[in-house]
Regions:
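Bacterial N-terminal signal peptides
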Residues: 1-8
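N-terminal targeting sequences that direct proteins away from the cytosol to non-cytosolic compartments
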Residues: 8-100, 112, 132-153, 163-169, ...
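Extracytoplasmic/secreted proteins, especially bacterial periplasmic and envelope-associated proteins
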Residues: 41, 106, 122, 126, ...
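Mid-length scaffold segments of soluble, non-membrane domains
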Residues: 108-122, 127-140
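Nucleotide and nucleotide-moiety/phosphate-recognizing core
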Residues: 157
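Extracellular C-type lectin-like domains
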Residues: 172-174
Length: 217
């Protein structure tokens, strides 16, 4: 399960757009993923991370969360082959002299090989257990809940991390299962004002309607 950012991965060639999962594309500040039917608009003055920076952040984050737990680190690394980082954007440039740099991430992880994961709640159940097992002391201020975004049900998990006695970072994980992938948004903030800015990005999202599931006679 994804605890930090996923790895950037490219799509296949020789297929029509939308037939196979890929990392999507940016058109200015608009992100599109035809396979998932996902479109969203990012603030023009926010800072999109390049694939190399994302991958470096992934490796660092995995080591911090896993600590000395080699089994957890190995599991995270194994999941990278099935994970695509679609969007990673910060409000300020990396290294800016600010108290906290709000971050918006969108990740897709293949789960078609895991028949027990049918909903975002199933996915986040395992993600929460992994967070609880990490060396970092996450707390969960409320139970997981369901929220409808762009006409689609997402399960939401809120996790908090006290970096200092007076500094609390909140991560909101919003997940749904779509065409064999968990579509996961991660909003990271330290104030309600920052949360509102991240939620405003999320509210630009549209998701194309999926064809009805096939029924067996």
């Amino acid at each position: 399960m994804v605890l930090v950012l996923g790895v950037w991965a490219g799509g296949g060639c020789g297929r029509k757009t939308g037939e196979q999962m890929d990392a999507g594309r940016f058109e200015g500040s608009v992100y599109r993923n035809d396979y998932l039917g996902l479109v969203m608009t990012l603030p023009a003055d926010w800072h999109i991370q390049d694939p190399q920076s994302v991958q470096e952040g992934v490796k660092t984050g995995e080591k911090i969360i896993a600590g000395k737990n080699e089994n957890m680190l190995a599991a995270m690394e194994a999941n990278q082959a099935k994970t695509l980082n679609l969007v990673s954007v910060f409000k300020f440039p990396m290294g800016a002299p600010v108290a906290y740099n709000p971050q918006f991430n969108c990740v897709a992880e293949e789960v078609s090989h895991l028949p027990g994961i049918q909903t975002g709640g199933d996915y986040l159940f395992h993600a929460k257990r992994n967070l609880e097992s990490s060396q970092m002391r996450f707390s969960f201020p409320r139970d997981m809940y369901v929220e409808t975004l762009a006409g689609v049900e997402f399960h939401v998990l809120t996790a908090r991390l006290a970096l200092l006695p007076t500094k609390i970072i909140t991560n909101e994980y919003l997940a749904t299962v779509r065409k064999g992938y968990t579509l996961l948004f991660i909003l990271s903030y330290s104030t309600e004002e920052e949360r509102t800015e991240l939620r405003n990005i999320l509210n630009t999202m549209t998701l194309a309607a999926l064809p009805p599931a096939k029924t067996t006679k």
